[in-house]
């Protein structure tokens, strides 16, 4: 692995250092890469759909990938805005399958929707969804195993129910993809 290789966390908006450090720690634990925090995008106005009052996540992914730092093998944006793709009312995140960019929104994962106090449950949700979306960038698809971190979640309760681990099958697929990429 190139010593410069990392996964870049790009906060869009203000986030606690506690949350960013939790995401970075889990990235290192799960994927084996150091994570650094660096602003890649700052203004998402280009992705705002005025009719829906939501942000089109695919447009954001395109810009993230185009502006990915050269030292980053992947970039994950963390945003406080409400995301959507045209076929769904909202998404917690989106990723380029086998690509270099993904995004997670905290907007719908925050119990109580607001306030400056962040709970451990909120941090756990964001961390799980960050690992889930990064998993897609390593070619992992949604998993039918309900406890697997790659399981598709329709609501906050689904996120809370799934574990923070890959099932055996997804773990093997991830290890194979990382080995194939000759990164680790």
What are these model-predicted stretches?
Residues 32-36, 60-64, 100-104, 128-131, ...:
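Glycine-rich loops and low-complexity Gly/Arg-rich segments
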Residues 10-14, 21-24, 91-125, 141-184:
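Metalloprotease/metallohydrolase-associated module, dominated by Zn2+-dependent proteases
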Residues 122-137:
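Short alpha-helix carrying the canonical HExxH Zn2+-binding catalytic motif
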Residues 1-85, 90:
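Propeptide-to-catalytic entry region of secreted or membrane-anchored zinc metalloproteases
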């Amino acid at each position: 692995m190139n010593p410069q290789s990392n996964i870049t966390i790009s906060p869009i908006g203000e986030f606690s250092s506690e949350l960013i450090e939790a995401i970075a720690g889990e990235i290192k634990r799960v994927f084996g890469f150091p994570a650094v925090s660096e602003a890649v995008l700052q203004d998402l106005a280009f992705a705002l759909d005025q009719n829906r009052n939501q942000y089109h996540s695919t447009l954001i992914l395109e810009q993230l990938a185009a502006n990915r730092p050269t030292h980053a093998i992947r970039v994950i944006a963390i945003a406080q805005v409400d995301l959507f793709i045209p076929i769904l009312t909202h998404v917690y995140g989106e990723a380029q399958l086998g690509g270099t960019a993904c995004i997670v929104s905290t907007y719908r994962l925050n119990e109580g929707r607001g306030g400056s106090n962040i709970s451990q449950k909120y941090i756990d949700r964001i961390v799980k969804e960050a690992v889930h979306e990064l998993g897609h960038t390593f070619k992992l698809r949604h998993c039918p195993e309900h406890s697997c971190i790659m399981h598709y979640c329709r609501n906050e309760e689904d996120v809370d129910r799934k574990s923070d681990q890959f099932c055996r099958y997804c773990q093997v697929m991830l290890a194979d993809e990382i080995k194939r990429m000759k990164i680790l």
